[in-house]
Amino acid sequence: MSKRYLQKATKGKLLIIIFIVTLWGKVVSSANHHKAHHVKTGTCEVVALHRCCNKNKIEERSQTVKCSCFPGQVAGTTRAAPSCVDASIVEQKWWCHMQPCLEGEECKVLPDRKGWSCSSGNKVKTTRVTH
């Protein structure tokens, strides 16, 4: 291949990459614009989800939630969904009082009180609270 051909091919690829990056930036900007809307008082919504597997093939999930709670309430979990719960539940770490598990699952506070587990049969879902 000639040197001139390689230069044109490289220039073409570079232009395509710049176009894709520019287009992607506009899509992300547009998506962020839609996220800025107000959450109804007393409700929560998921604004970002993250999911991966570690080397032990255990699936790890995390989410970012936006809540607008009434006075005396904070962000929590009810029936495996983000919700506003009484602040004393979180302050006292009485996690199972906010009913975080699905119907039919058993809730247990973790020994270090930094979260809870929901179990049904041999399936266990563990949630750790991070601030």
UniProtKB/Swiss-Prot annotation:
Record carries keyword Cytoplasm: yes
Chief place where the protein resides: cytoplasm
Pfam families reported for this sequence: TAFA
GO molecular function, one term: receptor ligand activity
GO terms under biological process: memory; visual learning
Keyword field contains Nucleus: yes
Signal peptide: 1-30
GO CC, any one term: cytoplasm
Classification via InterPro entries: Chemokine-like_TAFA, TAFA_chemokine-like
Keywords: Cytoplasm, Nucleus, Signal
Segments passing through the bilayer: none
Expression by tissue: Brain-specific.
Taxonomic superkingdom: Eukaryota
Cellular compartments annotated: Cytoplasm; Nucleus
Membership in a protein family: Belongs to the TAFA family.
Function: Has a role as neurotrophic factor involved in neuronal survival and neurobiological functions.
Protein name as catalogued: Chemokine-like protein TAFA-2
